[in-house]
UniProtKB/Swiss-Prot annotation:
InterPro entries: Ribosomal_uS14 (IPR001209), Ribosomal_uS14_bac/plastid (IPR023036), Ribosomal_uS14_CS (IPR018271). Belongs to the universal ribosomal protein uS14 family. Part of the 30S ribosomal subunit. Contacts proteins S3 and S10. It comes from the Bacteria. Binds 16S rRNA, required for the assembly of 30S particles and may also be responsible for determining the conformation of the 16S rRNA at the A site. GO terms for cellular component: cytoplasm; small ribosomal subunit. Keywords: Ribonucleoprotein, Ribosomal protein, RNA-binding, rRNA-binding. This is Small ribosomal subunit protein uS14. Signal peptide: none annotated. GO terms for biological process: translation. It comes from Fusobacterium nucleatum subsp. nucleatum (strain ATCC 25586 / DSM 15643 / BCRC 10681 / CIP 101130 / JCM 8532 / KCTC 2640 / LMG 13131 / VPI 4355).
Amino acid sequence: MAKKSMIARDVKRAKLVDKYAEKRAELKKRIAAGDMEAMFELNKLPKDSSAVRKRNRCQLDGRPRGYMREFGISRVKFRQLAGAGVIPGVKKSSW
């Protein structure tokens, strides 16, 4: 289980990313066109509003590593839930 403060920090970052995504994309488009003022405006936005600062975390325990995008959970929880038959369409393979 990850620390609650780390999970809360990541939730806050996710909200900031969603809030500023459109404005950030528009500013980046203007910067690519050569507008220097847009670069200054982009620098004024919060650092945590950048998408690269958000970390994928397991929805169940907040684990930041071993994240499986398809299911939104960590490999540890995936193995537990798949073994218990809770995840639909997933079964243990044998050949």
